[in-house]
């Protein structure tokens, strides 16, 4: 086991902390590390003593505290740099795929982000682990050290991360023509208060934000929850309710007459950003370049 200290912290202890967080329990971490559970417990306690902080909540699954998140992020960054160095030196294991974890919002996944992955050169040898999360919350996964990069609506960089604007995703207030004729025939502020609405999940605030722009406290309480981007759009096209549809998904359905934009002057733009660890990592650099190129081709400037 490598025990060289980084900034005074023994790497075996930091790696053990990461294993406990990833595996969820001390016993599972011991199995993954091929050591005894007592060795895992001793390493974590030694690290907590060295830092003077409680690093884990002893729950099931185990969760890092705010201080623990800093060290989890450190452990993942060290692992990333080790794999890059191994690949550059052609050492044993250099041919193994490199795993890159990214947090992405559902609408980006459904419209443009997968295209970015196909732009990454195959010789980079990357395997992607995507975590779907609302664009307002993806930065939290970066902060926790759960992912290396994220598509986020936040322009404020997470500590230790760089940020660049990708472009604007436009959302259009849409409904099926039949639904619009039945429920949306009148001033938007009046009809939106009563018309059934489709929302992604209970954290989806897009439709309520649209209603607030019209001077309403929220959209109708008659709402359908459809927690996939494709299903959300299909539910609106099927006439279940109205909703804010990403422009790339709305365009073909508007052209086909399956959707109508019932308030064209009230589109909503969300500026998306790319945040990633501030590391000199070829793997992250290749992904960031592909993401920027695809976003430029898909999103509004």
Where on the chain are the PLM-derived regions?
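A short LG(V/I)-centered, amphipathic sequence patch enriched
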Residues: 48-66
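Alpha-helical linker/hinge and terminal dimerization helices associated
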Residues: 50-51, 71-93
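Hydrophobic two-helix hairpin corresponding to the core of helix-turn-helix DNA-binding domains
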Residues: 17, 29-30, 65-68, 239
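Central regulatory/effector-binding core of bacterial HTH transcription factors
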Residues: 95-159
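Hydrophobic hinge/microswitch elements
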Residues: 137, 217-262
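Short helix-boundary/capping micro-motifs
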Residues: 18-34
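A late-sequence structural motif
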Residues: 264-301
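Secondary-structure junction motif
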Residues: 193-217
